[in-house]
């Protein structure tokens, strides 16, 4: 049976050997070049392929059409993936009549994603395993073909558990590969409600936070012990690594991080104490705990810290350009609620952020991004995270002022992106659901949906393509120059402070604000082309919580990701939105101050937006990336959002001239 194999690591070598032993004909092997910054303790797939006389390749992007075509020419009957680190596109998976199968190092559906070996130890699990499953578009989500359980002993560390998983893999493949070859397998669908997903880990994720229980810190040490980079802490500015440890149920009133004793080297934790059995100071040699204490100059009562002393208390500096806007002011409120952020903001007005102007950790300058370029460059260099939220994002402006949309939304933001590249700063960039354009997918997917727009003579698309091109530029900078980025795509966020009624009076606002103005002034609610277009409306609080988690970036899971932020359950047409808003308006305690409802009026889009407008019939997000990267899902019902948004705007109206 002819196969093409994607493989890396020890598991890749085991998979190749098992396939050959089972009589498979391997036409080609795809692997990775070794990362010089990674300690290579595992077998080389490339060396094994060369020794066995099998063609081997390590392309940067195996999903490129040229590679898809070359793989198609090999006519594989079945495809296997053993610890290959990149997702394989559906075009390749569909090439094999018998299907494609992946080996994953956990008991799926638990611990989907990256580094399951380390994560199960971090989380103190007592059991894991290996799973062979059918490959589908979504990572690690296909039907299970075979599983083998592996017990995790209390003294297991990452390398011993790795060896156990290798042994289990050998057994699993010996039992299963002949059955696949003869088409005699039983597949069991994964239970999505039991699925968990974890992102990649980096060495920086393994710092020891002494306020946590000793058992949690011990599990961290086990999870990243040699040959992994190791768990670490600091004495002042001196970094040291803990290679092995023990938990002591030591009852102590000492502050977490305090040295309780030198021999053995015991450190007070949030619960219990951790004995450092072996460790290493800086880039030195490994030594036992009491010698490490001497090397570090520790005495009883010394304090350890999770970060270098000079930076331990510095707040994360967040630069928000467009801080007075809808997203900017709500995000500022969320960040200042915590005690570890310093917010720097620029905007042309300050009405929405006036409540923060006296906050000690909020720094605001009134200005225009097209003029204050030196201020912006200085603060990009100064800050840790940059959010360029300035954009023209109201549909009527796309046809009314297309060049201004391009100049602000594309040209000005490109300059900021290049500052982030220059100073190696993390950028969180607001893409838009508009980039999907007229995509026909039921759910718009960040990684697979096509981005489809209308012809050039429809200037309505200038906003969409400006944002899309910036998405592609940012992605390219990430791939080629190491820019740390996350793209987020809001789907019709709404809530208090979305535009204002004055903007709505000139047509320069989003849908709900325009509808509220119609109710306030007693003018007909205009339904563009009948108002049948469907959108998924998202409460600003849900959206901001997701954005806050992107900024937090737990485990660096958001790096290099595109994340839709929307509520697929809150789908409604513009007509339905208007009806819900009207019902809420009629029940509001301030209703008697406003004129009678003037009814709905159907108007053509060309008469409202002008020549060159096209609309989109539906726009529903897939939020699988938000689940995976943020552990987030929206919670707030659309009716609650409508009620609160309406209430906010009605209470901003001057009622002195209104009838009572």
Curated annotation (Swiss-Prot):
<dbReference type="Pfam" id="PF01370">
    <property type="entry name" value="Epimerase"/>
</dbReference>
<dbReference type="InterPro" id="IPR001509">
    <property type="entry name" value="Epimerase_deHydtase"/>
</dbReference>
<keyword id="KW-0443">Lipid metabolism</keyword>
<feature type="binding site">
    <location>
        <position position="393"/>
    </location>
    <ligand>
        <name>UDP-alpha-D-glucuronate</name>
    </ligand>
</feature>
<comment type="subunit">
    <text>Homohexamer, formed by a dimer of trimers.</text>
</comment>
<dbReference type="InterPro" id="IPR036291">
    <property type="entry name" value="NAD(P)-bd_dom_sf"/>
</dbReference>
<keyword id="KW-0560">Oxidoreductase</keyword>
<feature type="active site" description="Proton acceptor; for decarboxylase activity">
    <location>
        <position position="434"/>
    </location>
</feature>
<dbReference type="GO" id="GO:0046677">
    <property type="term" value="P:response to antibiotic"/>
</dbReference>
<dbReference type="InterPro" id="IPR011034">
    <property type="entry name" value="Formyl_transferase-like_C_sf"/>
</dbReference>
<keyword id="KW-0444">Lipid biosynthesis</keyword>
<feature type="binding site">
    <location>
        <position position="398"/>
    </location>
    <ligand>
        <name>UDP-alpha-D-glucuronate</name>
    </ligand>
</feature>
<keyword id="KW-0448">Lipopolysaccharide biosynthesis</keyword>
<keyword id="KW-0511">Multifunctional enzyme</keyword>
<dbReference type="InterPro" id="IPR036477">
    <property type="entry name" value="Formyl_transf_N_sf"/>
</dbReference>
<protein>
    <recommendedName>
        <fullName>Bifunctional polymyxin resistance protein ArnA</fullName>
        <ecNumber>2.1.2.13</ecNumber>
        <ecNumber>1.1.1.305</ecNumber>
    </recommendedName>
</protein>
<comment type="similarity">
    <text>In the C-terminal section; belongs to the NAD(P)-dependent epimerase/dehydratase family. UDP-glucuronic acid decarboxylase subfamily.</text>
</comment>
<dbReference type="GO" id="GO:0099619">
    <property type="term" value="F:UDP-4-amino-4-deoxy-L-arabinose formyltransferase activity"/>
</dbReference>
<feature type="binding site">
    <location>
        <position position="613"/>
    </location>
    <ligand>
        <name>UDP-alpha-D-glucuronate</name>
    </ligand>
</feature>
<comment type="similarity">
    <text>In the N-terminal section; belongs to the Fmt family. UDP-L-Ara4N formyltransferase subfamily.</text>
</comment>
<dbReference type="GO" id="GO:0016831">
    <property type="term" value="F:carboxy-lyase activity"/>
</dbReference>
<dbReference type="Pfam" id="PF02911">
    <property type="entry name" value="Formyl_trans_C"/>
</dbReference>
<comment type="pathway">
    <text>Nucleotide-sugar biosynthesis; UDP-4-deoxy-4-formamido-beta-L-arabinose biosynthesis; UDP-4-deoxy-4-formamido-beta-L-arabinose from UDP-alpha-D-glucuronate: step 1/3.</text>
</comment>
<dbReference type="GO" id="GO:0009245">
    <property type="term" value="P:lipid A biosynthetic process"/>
</dbReference>
<feature type="region of interest" description="Dehydrogenase ArnADH">
    <location>
        <begin position="314"/>
        <end position="660"/>
    </location>
</feature>
<feature type="binding site">
    <location>
        <begin position="136"/>
        <end position="140"/>
    </location>
    <ligand>
        <name>(6R)-10-formyltetrahydrofolate</name>
    </ligand>
</feature>
<feature type="active site" description="Proton donor; for decarboxylase activity">
    <location>
        <position position="619"/>
    </location>
</feature>
<feature type="binding site">
    <location>
        <begin position="86"/>
        <end position="88"/>
    </location>
    <ligand>
        <name>(6R)-10-formyltetrahydrofolate</name>
    </ligand>
</feature>
<keyword id="KW-0441">Lipid A biosynthesis</keyword>
<keyword id="KW-0520">NAD</keyword>
<keyword id="KW-0808">Transferase</keyword>
<feature type="region of interest" description="Formyltransferase ArnAFT">
    <location>
        <begin position="1"/>
        <end position="304"/>
    </location>
</feature>
<comment type="function">
    <text>Bifunctional enzyme that catalyzes the oxidative decarboxylation of UDP-glucuronic acid (UDP-GlcUA) to UDP-4-keto-arabinose (UDP-Ara4O) and the addition of a formyl group to UDP-4-amino-4-deoxy-L-arabinose (UDP-L-Ara4N) to form UDP-L-4-formamido-arabinose (UDP-L-Ara4FN). The modified arabinose is attached to lipid A and is required for resistance to polymyxin and cationic antimicrobial peptides.</text>
</comment>
<feature type="active site" description="Proton donor; for formyltransferase activity">
    <location>
        <position position="104"/>
    </location>
</feature>
<feature type="binding site">
    <location>
        <begin position="368"/>
        <end position="369"/>
    </location>
    <ligand>
        <name>NAD(+)</name>
    </ligand>
</feature>
<dbReference type="InterPro" id="IPR002376">
    <property type="entry name" value="Formyl_transf_N"/>
</dbReference>
<feature type="binding site">
    <location>
        <position position="460"/>
    </location>
    <ligand>
        <name>UDP-alpha-D-glucuronate</name>
    </ligand>
</feature>
<keyword id="KW-0046">Antibiotic resistance</keyword>
<dbReference type="GO" id="GO:0016020">
    <property type="term" value="C:membrane"/>
</dbReference>
<dbReference type="InterPro" id="IPR021168">
    <property type="entry name" value="Bifun_polymyxin_resist_ArnA"/>
</dbReference>
<dbReference type="Pfam" id="PF00551">
    <property type="entry name" value="Formyl_trans_N"/>
</dbReference>
<dbReference type="GO" id="GO:0009103">
    <property type="term" value="P:lipopolysaccharide biosynthetic process"/>
</dbReference>
């Amino acid at each position: 049976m002819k196969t093409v194999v994607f493989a890396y690591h020890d598991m890749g070598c085991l998979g190749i050997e098992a396939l050959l032993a089972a009589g498979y004909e391997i036409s080609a092997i795809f692997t990775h070049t070794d990362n010089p910054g990674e300690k290579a303790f595992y077998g080389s797939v490339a060396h094994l392929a060369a020794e066995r006389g099998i063609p081997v390749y390590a392309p940067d992007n195996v999903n490129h059409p040229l590679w898809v075509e070359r793989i198609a020419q090999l006519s594989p009957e079945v495809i296997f993936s053993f610890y290959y680190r990149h997702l394989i596109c559906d075009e390749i998976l569909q090439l094999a009549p018998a299907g494609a199968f992946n080996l994953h190092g956990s008991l799926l559906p638990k611990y989907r994603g990256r580094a399951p070996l380390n994560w199960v130890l971090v989380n103190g699990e007592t059991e894991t395993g290996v799973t062979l499953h059918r490959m589908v578009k979504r990572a690690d989500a296909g039907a299970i073909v075979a599983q083998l359980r592996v017990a995790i002993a209390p003294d297991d560390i990452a390398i011993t558990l790795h060896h156990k998983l290798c042994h289990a893999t050998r057994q699993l493949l010996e039992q299963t590969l002949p059955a696949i070859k003869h088409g005699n397998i039983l597949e069991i669908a994964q239970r999505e409600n039991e699925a968990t997903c974890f992102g990649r880990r980096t060495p920086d994720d393994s710092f020891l936070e002494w306020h946590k229980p000793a058992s949690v810190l011990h599990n961290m040490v086990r999870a990243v012990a040699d040959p992994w980079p190791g768990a670490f802490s600091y004495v002042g500015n001196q970094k040291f690594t803990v290679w092995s440890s023990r938990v002591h149920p030591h009852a102590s009133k000492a502050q977490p991080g305090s040295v309780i004793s030198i021999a053995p080297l015991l450190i007070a934790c949030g619960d219990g104490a951790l004995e450092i059995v072996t460790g290493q100071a800086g880039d030195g040699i490994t030594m036992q705990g009491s010698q490490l204490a001497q090397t570090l100059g520790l005495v009883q009562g010394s304090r350890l810290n999770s970060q270098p002393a000079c930076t331990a208390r510095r707040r994360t500096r967040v630069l928000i350009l467009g801080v007075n806007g809808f997203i900017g002011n709500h995000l500022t409120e969320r960040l200042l609620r915590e005690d570890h952020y310093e917010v720097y903001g620029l905007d042309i007005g300050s009405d929405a952020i006036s409540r923060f102007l006296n906050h000690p950790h909020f720094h605001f300058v009134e200005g225009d991004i097209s003029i204050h370029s030196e201020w912006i460059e200085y603060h990009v260099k100064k800050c840790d995270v940059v959010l360029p939220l300035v954009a023209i994002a109201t549909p009527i402006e796309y046809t009314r002022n297309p060049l201004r949309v391009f100049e602000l939304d594309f040209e000005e933001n490109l300059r900021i992106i290049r500052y982030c590249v220059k100073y190696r700063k993390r950028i969180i960039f607001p893409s838009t659901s508009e980039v999907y354009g007229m995509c026909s997918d039921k759910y718009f997917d960040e990684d697979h949906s096509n981005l489809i727009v209308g012809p050039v003579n429809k200037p309505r698309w200038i906003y969409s393509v400006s944002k899309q091109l910036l998405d592609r530029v940012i992605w390219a900078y990430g791939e080629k120059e190491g820019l740390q980025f996350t793209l987020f795509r809001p789907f019709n966020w709404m809530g208090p402070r979305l535009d204002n009624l004055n903007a709505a009076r000139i047509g320069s606002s989003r849908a709900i604000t325009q509808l509220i103005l119609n109710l306030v002034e007693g003018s007909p609610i205009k339904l563009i082309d009948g108002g049948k277009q469907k959108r998924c409306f998202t409460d600003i609080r849900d959206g901001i919580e997701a954005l806050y988690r992107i900024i937090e970036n737990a485990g660096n899971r958001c790096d290099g990701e595109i994340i839709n932020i929307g509520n697929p359950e809150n789908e409604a047409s513009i007509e339905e939105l208007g009806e819900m808003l009207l019902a809420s308006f009629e029940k509001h305690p301030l209703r008697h101050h406003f004129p009678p409802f003037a009814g709905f009026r159907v108007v053509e889009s060309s008469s409202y937006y002008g020549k060159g407008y096209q609309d989109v019939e539906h726009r529903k997000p897939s939020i699988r990336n938000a689940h995976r990267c943020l552990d987030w899902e929206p919670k707030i019902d659309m009716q609650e959002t409508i009620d609160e948004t309406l209430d906010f705007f009605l209470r901003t109206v001057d009622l002195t001239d209104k009838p009572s």
